[in-house]
Amino acid sequence: IPFHTLNFDPKISSWGINFQRTVRRKNEEILWSGHKRNQGIYRPQNAGLLTGLNNISQGLGLEVVGYGKVEGSKIENGLGKEYNKNANINGGLDVNYNVTSGLKASLTLNTDFAETEVDERQINLTRFPIRFPEKRDFFLEGANIFRFASSSGVYPYFSRKIGLQSGNPVPILYGGRIIGKIGKIEVAAKQVKTRETDFINSEDFSVIRLKQNFLKESSIGILYTRRHTKKGKEFIPPLHDRNTLGLDLSLNTSTFLKNKNLQFQAFAVIHNPTTPGEISSSIGDRSARGLRFNFPNDPWSGSLSYRE
């Protein structure tokens, strides 16, 4: 893994790290730094210590990737040997820059997702929509920071809604983001503008996420999203701005009763009225809230939750 792709403080010569090898046919797991079965490999406090990382550098911390695309079509128009011909030349640019050792800024112009893995085909027999996982690189980085109240089942920010309208792809004109950590505060901000099409006007998508870590495994955070539709074609009805604000709290410990896991999570989300029918609605009708106690241990586990 090239060092220039990682955010780290070059003054620190010791890193926490862990490795795991899984042998399925033997149902066997081999760990470099062991951990209790209740905790798992992804907890930083279970990592081993890798020392001797001296004189390493991120370089300039600048990455520039461009692309070019040429398309052509030749379609018979039904008049003998005559054809309708069409040609299109397109291009775009992606720029990433490490502002500090823990903060990264990115810019994308005329974004292309041609190399993105396609979704797996699924059959949905329920009345609820399927949430396909995000696979586009621009939206994948920092996804863990944007994750809101992970066990609540509430998604005030879902990146797959950007660049897609009623199953139809919408081209992205440009986008910018800042992702990283300032002290103990995790910071993520994203701004994306989509192109006007035959069925939707140009739109701006904005999202800001701040998460403060405290104690060893706990955090409190705030999330704000905004979707603004520009005025465009007269036959497309104008839409009000859609604003959402969310707060979430996560209290976790892996030392309950010495070596047990105990988790508590609470959240609240509210959005503004976006249609004439919602203007007179109460705050309760435009909000969601909930809490959850979880005791995820082996062999005994249990949970208690409330949500409305």
Located regions from the model:
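Outer-membrane beta-barrel channel domains
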Residues: 1-74, 78-308
